[in-house]
Amino acid sequence: MDSTNLCNALRMEFEGIFENKIPLDAFPAKIQDMILALSRQENYSIEYMMASLLVAVSTAIGNAVNIRIRGGWISNPALYMILVGRPGMGKTPPLDFAFRPIRKHDAKIIKQFKLDMEHYNSLVENNKAKKDKSSSLPDKPILRRTIISDFTPEALMRALDDNQRGVVVYVDEIMGMFNAVNQYSKGQLIEQLLTAFSGKPLDISRCSIPVPIHIEHPFINIVGTMQTTRMHELIEKGYKDNGLIDRIIFVYPSSQEISDWGLDEESSVSTFGKYSSMWDSIINKVISLPFIENEDGRAIHNVLEFSSEAKAYFTNWRNNAVRAVNQIQDDGLVDSRVIKAPTITARLALVLQILRWACGEEHKDFVDIDSTKSAIALSEYFENCYTNIQKYMLRESVEPQKRELLDCLSATFTTADAIQAGKEVGLSERSVMYSLVSLATNKVIKKVKRGEYEKLQ
């Protein structure tokens, strides 16, 4: 272990990262160092920061590099991600930091586009003034921006058509986007997002679009923030039933405490500048990966394979998860997210391999065993986040008096324990029995055997 890794390990031990099972060691050493430094200095949440960097790298890669998951199954590294937490948790600052280099890249492109349009419009006007109008005009400039924040579904599809390397839907309070989707597009955008995630072609025909849009290999990332109390709205909109939620990575820190501010150190500005510059260089290196299109405008993908060792490890991990699902007899107890996990995990492995290359720590010839193991660790961490969100939503859905009853009970309890606790909170024996049936039906508790129960949250 070199000095940087040793230093990072000691800092992670001090911060309680290992204790909270946060897989910060899945990242390259210089990224670990950056996350730890900015967490202490800027109060960035380590967990939000980890996730923000991943989706930023994924965005920078776009359709430039794909991964072969199995046989003919090839995938881009697209990720749908939502940072969840109470107000004041600091969800936005790490996201802004992670995407700052891509915003700078977009700003340069927009500036050049404006100049190109001025030149093009000037040529058009000059051509109008000529008697001989046979002189040809150059192609009209196209704006190939990456970050899309304020948009209609049609505008998003146009932006994706113009920039087939890929775009990211970046919305701070993301429930606003979902509400607008339901109000204006009758759910069409959600269907397009489901299609894009699966890597299937998008075809859009509208009266307002003179030439129909066909996108053979759509790449759309989604990233945003959401308050914990609004999570239930995603369920109510039917996004669990249609599978959208199964495709979203939710990031929910192990601690929901808002950190104190420390006093600024004299070197804080220069330290922030140092890491900001380093991150700029890393993202710009990823953006420099060539995205090649043939004469028909179709992408020629650079496809990375798993190494033989990585493929065996990944396949074994996936098979173990599926075997566990196959043991479940009740279809209602099957977690549909398990089926999507291999796709998301393979994409994370690709993102990590490219990030390690951009940091100067590894190659980009194939996805190795280290990137694969790290991706699995991250995937399992993110699923734990989702489980904790589910527990929160279950708890919030319980009526206040039943919640009081639960608070008086241990993790495992008997009917007699519940009746005694009911007396303490003013519930009759009959009310307690009805409450136990209701809580078990809603999967807040589980009946282990006659007269014995276990809390599921």
Can you annotate each of these PLM segments?
Residues M1-Q457:
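Phosphate-handling catalytic cores of nucleic-acid transaction enzymes
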